[in-house]
Amino acid sequence: MNRRTVLGSALIGAAAATAGSASAQSAPKPKGKTGPRNLITDVAGIRVGQAHDANARTGVSVILAEVPAIAAVDVRGGGPAGRETDVLKAENLVQEVDAIVLSGGSVYGLASADGIAAWMGMRGRGYGMGGAAGVPPSPIVPAACIYDLANGGDKQWGMDPPYRTLAVQALESASDSFTLGTAGAGYGAQAGGLKGGTGSASAVTADGWTVGAIVAVNSVGATIAPGSRQFWAAPFEIDAEFGGLGSAELSAAHEDWGDAKFNPRPRENTTIAVVATDVALTRVECQRMAIMAQDGLSRAVRPAHAPFDGDTVFVLSTGKITIDDPAQRNIAVSRLGNIAADVLARAIARGVYEATAYDGSATGTWKSLS
């Protein structure tokens, strides 16, 4: 074989390899698998109920653990509104919660957890020190709220804000299915310059573990790229769950925040979420998962964790699946945390994608964009 033949063979081989590589790069990448509902309720032991007041433009979402669940929380925003978050610190006594409430109403919305606690205590559910006769239990009901007081709804409620009543209505309607978009805690939300809402998503691993998230999206930051309809969460989308526009042209200059709320001025905000898994985790492991899940906010919202936000993520472990090998636990927590971030990013995009305008609202929806 002469030199020319050898060179020609090498070029043909290189061209074939390049073509194969290009073909591999252009081939559709495998996507993850969602649960049957693509909701947080795909996690065994979790139900969700929602209620809203259309006149006040506000609402409540209750995430119910069918039996008390191990929980943790991570707070990153500069202006949070929360209840019982200190209870969830790893050094404290109580490990399990009965429910978590996401609510509109800012400080007024914190009363939503009062309604849940009273409802549960009356039925004998909650933390107790021996259950002495006549001593009610103490239901553990952490809560976080978004600021939706300036969205044009009637907030002249005087001494009777609606949140306690809305929370009980939500709890009593808790089920496996619930509405996304303009519903529940996200009813009165605004995400950047678009109508925000309640979003949810889930993922199932090859091992059969399930991770789900529910979120009220009321961010100061934008969920779409500047000059685009593409969601920042697009790289993580499964089965066109929020429009299927892809991520090929996602880009932005570092000072271009697009449709954020900084024009004309920053306004009150907060994105609040609950992530759940059916894998049995300790409080410390739930805490690590919550920390990692916050990355989902950064993947889906730009900017995130701003001084004007109150970004808060709770994690629940329902303990249906156990991992007995100690050597595998840290790996499992790492996997769960990464999946949680992706699922939360998807849930954020779904909340905005599914949002609809209420009558008289000046805030455009994602679906109204041309």
Regions found by a protein language model. Give the residues of each.
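Hydrophobic side chains in well-ordered alpha-helices of soluble proteins
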Residues: 6, 116, 167-170
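A structural signal for small-residue-enriched, beta-sheet-centric alpha/beta enzyme cores
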Residues: 29-107, 122-370
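Active-site-adjacent structural elements in enzyme catalytic domains
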Residues: 114-121
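C-terminal segment of classical bacterial N-terminal signal peptides
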Residues: 17-21
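Boundary at the C-terminal end of the N-terminal hydrophobic targeting segment
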Residues: 22-26
